[in-house]
Design a protein with these regions (language model features):
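C-terminal accessory/binding modules appended to enzymatic or scaffolding proteins
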Residues: 7-10, 14-51, 56-61
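Structural recognition of alpha->loop->beta junctions
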Residues: 75-85, 89
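A structured beta-alpha segment of the ubiquitous adenosine-cofactor-binding alpha/beta core
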Residues: 88-98
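Active-site nucleotide/adenylate-binding loops and adjacent lid/helix of ATP-dependent enzymes
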Residues: 97, 135, 139-192
Length: 192
């Protein structure tokens, strides 16, 4: 039999029996980046593919959740199981409740899975790697700046601005060139 028949593509349905296979391996779910957008997405898919590959090499059952059929992470031979699902909490929660993974990896898929961190944590699932608090401190620009200063990590001169007046004052203090970035955004559409 072709290897394609040994892989599972899974789609959610209601009111039907469960006919997927199970293993004795520890399960880890990787949440992908979803749709690619100009300037965002491909690098996160690359991270997810390598994460899934490492999980499989180390004896874990690698389960991928992603909504983009045009990515490498959704190829038939990448993960042990693949769920084509919107990367919204209700759909992700349904997969997690069904699979009962030992842990969930959200750090490889960019901003989309990071936005699910609190929900995943509050639902009692283990987030692999960074804790919810650490994730928050890296996404909040002010907290991250303070963390770097506390650890004596060199960083570019920066300021936090919460108004247009503070922004102009900060730019005048720092000088050009200047990079403006909001908290809790890596890039893409949310940069508006």
């Amino acid at each position: 039999a072709s290897d394609v028949y040994k892989r599972q593509y899974l789609y959610s349905t209601n009111g039907v029996s469960n006919d997927d296979t199970t293993t004795d391996k520890k399960k880890v779910v990787v949440i992908g980046s979803g749709p690619n957008r100009i300037g965002q997405g491909i690098e996160f898919d690359y991270c997810c593919v390598h994460g899934v590959s490492s999980l499989k090499e180390n004896g874990y059952e690698a389960i991928m959740i992603n909504s983009n059929p045009e990515t490498v992470s959704t190829d038939y031979d990448t993960a042990d199981k693949l769920y084509f699902e919107p990367l919204a909490w209700n759909e992700v929660k349904a997969v997690l409740n069904r699979e009962k993974p030992d842990s969930v990896i959200i750090q490889l898929g960019g901003q989309t899975p990071l936005k699910l961190a609190k929900n995943i944590h509050d639902a009692g699932f283990s987030i692999a790697g960074s804790s919810l608090e650490v994730i928050d401190s890296t996404e909040d620009r002010d907290l991250f700046q303070k963390l770097c200063s506390k650890q004596n990590i060199k960083q570019p001169l920066s300021r936090i601005a919460n108004s247009e007046v503070e922004l102009v004052d900060s730019v005048n203090h720092i000088g050009f060139p200047v990079l403006l970035r909001p908290s809790y955004v890596l890039g893409g559409r949310a940069m508006r």
